[in-house]
């Protein structure tokens, strides 16, 4: 609390959704309750959960829930019927789901789908064997690059592809920071930390929380005290607006929106 203010008198604003990750982790470490407005919490975002599912499967090959979540992410032509065949074969042979993927011919799966299953299986096994040899950061970055997750979002025409790209990049940054703090820690320890953060989020249901949101989401709202974070060239204003006068002017207008969310005090933060 600042000057005996309650948490709900404060708001922290940022330019892009991906910036919330560092803020959320800091708030959790300090025991500060918070709400995310206009988005979901960082580790609950679909693309982040997909990458985490890859990492969980690499740590535990028996994690069928994670396997089914990402067997066709990014899209590799493995449809629901193929997955059902794999499940049935796994139950018939009484072996783990992951094991049936190395022999798709046995399930009468051929052609591109067979190749896709083989490739997926080989990647998972490769990184499962590397999990104790590489740092969490090295493993995650190499995996994401080999699978092509960032390039998938970079090439996507979906309107939120840039946000999803940024979120995956921010997740990799989070893992790098973890590895720097814990150079001897394995990937499983990072995943335990993420699970703990999620548990803390779900446990604290108080309404007296700091509000975290993008500047766009803050339009029409006001708070006694506002922190505007990430005022660094390339982040706010965004890098791709610096050479366009109209885009740069829009960034100025957005900054004005952020400033005027504060009723009493505003703090400008930069790295």
What are these regions (language model features)?
Residues 6, 74, 100-217, 221-222, ...:
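Accessory C-terminal helicase-associated subdomains
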Residues 51, 55-59, 67, 71, ...:
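Conserved RecA-like P-loop NTPase helicase motor core
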Residues 231-271:
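C-terminal accessory regions
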Residues 1-68, 155-166, 173, 185, ...:
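Conserved motor-region signature of P-loop NTPase helicases/translocases
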Residues 217, 226-233:
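Short Ser/Thr-interspersed hydrophobic loop/turn segments at strand-loop and sheet-helix junctions
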Residues 84-89:
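C-terminal helical "lid" of AAA+/P-loop NTPase domains
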